[in-house]
Amino acid sequence: MGDPKRQRKKYETPSHPWIKERLDRERVLMKKYALKNKKELWRHETQLKEFRRRARRLLAARGKQAEIERAQLLQRLNRLGLLPADAVLDDVLSLTVEDVLDRRLQTIVFKKGLARTIRQARQLIVHGHIEVNGQIIRSPGYLVLKEEEDTITYSKTSPFAKESHPERMVIEQAKQGEAS
């Protein structure tokens, strides 16, 4: 039977734990995006570091394989909605952690108006009220692809799917209040 794949952390912790500027920046992001803990933030920061590391390596590389990898990296970031279709590798270096956090399912559910607050968006996702592309996703940190963005709705089995649900009426009234 082969050995199981080794479990690895998907995030890197900060090199120094008590840098005030970093702590203040993290606190603002934690509140704005309603993250559960710093680990969620560090996971997305590590993802961004990896994209940037690959871009720096590919900027210096020459050859046919480097061209293929450049195209693959840009295509991946385009599918995630982090970069436009006509982006170049220098655009990867200008990405910020906010760009990645804006692609989380939790943030998109809130911005689409399916929840009143970003915290309620997290609760709706965890409780299985939200589906993406016909599939219930229970992970608020799921990075939504650009083509999946239009398929985010309430789950068919969720009470929120009914227009007459009391909470949904409150959300609709809040939307109309903002529009006026």
Swiss-Prot record:
Q: Which UniProt keywords apply?
A: Ribonucleoprotein, Ribosomal protein, RNA-binding, rRNA-binding
What's an example GO cellular component term for this entry?
Answer: small ribosomal subunit
Every S4 RNA-binding domain range: 103-165
- Chain spans, region Disordered: 159-180
SUPFAM superfamilies hit by this protein: Alpha-L RNA-binding motif (SSF55174)
GO annotation (BP), single: ribosomal small subunit biogenesis
Q: Has keyword Amino-acid biosynthesis?
A: no
UniProt GO molecular function: rRNA binding; structural constituent of ribosome
Q: Which CDD domains match?
A: S4
Q: What does this protein do?
A: One of the primary rRNA binding proteins, it binds directly to 16S rRNA where it nucleates assembly of the body of the 30S subunit.
Cite the record's note on assembly.
Part of the 30S ribosomal subunit. Contacts protein S5. The interaction surface between S4 and S5 is involved in control of translational fidelity.
What family does the database annotate?
Belongs to the universal ribosomal protein uS4 family.
Q: Fetch the PANTHER family from UniProt.
A: 30S 40S RIBOSOMAL PROTEIN (PTHR11831), 40S RIBOSOMAL PROTEIN S9 (PTHR11831:SF5)
* Protein name listed in UniProt: Small ribosomal subunit protein uS4
Originating species: Thermococcus onnurineus (strain NA1)
